[in-house]
Amino acid sequence: QLNGETVYTACETNVFSLFSLLPGTPYTVAVQAEGETLTLDFTTEAETFFVDASRYGLVADGETDNTGRLQAALSTCPRGGTVYVPAGRYRTASLFMKSCTTLYLEKGAVLLGDNDRTHYPILPGVIPSENEVDEYYLTGWEGNPLDSFAGLLNITQVHDVVVTGEGTLDCDAQNGDWWVNPKVKRIAWRPRAVAAVDSENVCLHGITVQNSFSWTIHPIFVKHLDLLNFNINNPYNAPNTDGIDPESCEYIRIIGMNIHVGDDCIAMKASKVFLGMKLKRSCEHTVIRNCLLDKGHGGIVIGSEMSGGVKDMVVTQCLMDHTDRGLRVKTRRGRGNTAVIDGLVFRNVEMRGVKAPFVINMFYFCDPDGHGPYVQCREAMPVDEYTPKLGSLTMENIVATDAQFAGCYFDGLPEQPIERVTMKNVTITFDPNAKEGQAAMADNRPLVKKLAIYAENVKNIKLHNVKIEGYEGERLRFANVGHFEED
């Protein structure tokens, strides 16, 4: 109830949104469940000005180019103001937010991406300074600072920005050439649906983002990032259309998301070796909870672009439904000694039909040299400045049903084994009709089916109340595992 009026009944989720609230107004929310009532009093933030974008001459026919009109509304919005976009279909190319403003997309409002790539500005990957020493990184492609088209919505070097409402950002990529030969650079690399760079206090909430050109939500060097209770929808066969890819960001909250994509649902990143080792900016202090992760390649993924490191991440109360892998860590030699993954906790997670629930792969065959001997050699190589490291991973209170390939597949480097894997109260059940497949994307690894727990090159493994049902062969298949404990 909101101020005594019922707004939701029979809710199946415990993250929900309230829209069309008045600014600077006190409210009381009451939630009733199982005979108990909880209340919360709050006051909405004040608003300086309400800017109706339709007054800027918008044409809502889905064909007319509205880029200039929409950008005029965003650029002239006063500090603390809201740009309101009413229902309608508005064709547009790249838009840029400014600090201390809100973009509100009304229900039925659709910002529809321009299908002509020549209408999108190109953002330089690197801008040199006058002293020719410092550099400014404006965009990137798969972990490197390469020239790319600006996104449909850009949040660049700003602060205190909110994008909210029940409207839609539709890149309309299926009707352009964005998914044709996706690995080929044409003029510049593909844009993102929402690109945020070098910004602080950024919040996306409530909206739907769909049919992205490539990665959907791609924040780089963003501090205090909230992604709250909105939808990401991309076709399963759409190439490289990850859902959320925070890169070298800090203090991230990803809560109540519904993600249906053609690649990884959420992938935590920290650049490739050039930027990772130069800037040493990790992705850290992340909370992911109450999210639905549906039919992507991976549910929660770390890497493979992670040369700056990924640390201090907690994932809880999430549902992964028919993703290829559940928890997926992917790295390789060459990411650098700054590529440290540590302090990852996964708890209270359910997986349904996930083919390989837990995969740690330090032989991931990405990049042009990914199949070469340096990456794929199974013999120990010298530990040097290019050797990545995996620290502590904890998984507890997890149920995975209808797995197929492998329940747990942990493949560390012989020269730098995985430091510690702890599993507590974990149950994995295999699909009786499971088909064999590749648990981890590495060379010279056999196809597997109903493989319970495989571990190679791991220093410490601790299992407490870990149940595997319906597996074939040995329950534990270990090679070069140091200390093992099970109770």
Model-predicted segments: where are they?
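Extracellular/periplasmic carbohydrate-active domains that bind, remodel
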Residues: Q1-D487
